């Protein structure tokens, strides 16, 4: 269910409250720093690499100098790998205040390298979007469906009637946890430990044989 972030504040401290709120949102919407940017891909982007630029700080969400625009038609598809696991709690989609703004997003989890044909499979969740040129509307995924996500796919199949879709900002809010490989670490450690344990014995044996 989408909801806005703008609030009415009465009395003193209006500006301070707005600043505090902006700082809080900036911290909450920092999952973009956990994206494996080198392997992030955007299908049907008009300018190569432009899809990566819409994942930026919350306070830069209204920066119109960086955006992604679709090429052949209105579809855009983002394959977003993370450097660990996330629990997705909120999404903001900021586009132009015209018909190029996407009107729907379909979300898939843990399906790397999806294509437009792959997007026909059962979706994990989808939202009807509202024009949001200021980046004030948050869409809240069902956390139970997105509690352990290492790869996220966002598919925008259409817009409000333009030939091309344009997006300025995609914000992701949630929790992040590092990917741990305890089994590998322990095995490597044990292998090194065993070699060290037997090192002296091996050399002792060789020494005795030579003598």
Swiss-Prot record:
Record GO cellular component, one term: cytoplasm
Domain PITH, residue spans: 20-192
Pfam families: PITH
PANTHER family referenced in this protein's UniProt entry, alphabetically: AD039 HT014 THIOREDOXIN FAMILY TRP26, PITH DOMAIN-CONTAINING PROTEIN 1
Family: Belongs to the PITHD1 family.
Name of this chain's protein: PITH domain-containing protein GA19395
Organism: Drosophila pseudoobscura pseudoobscura (Fruit fly)
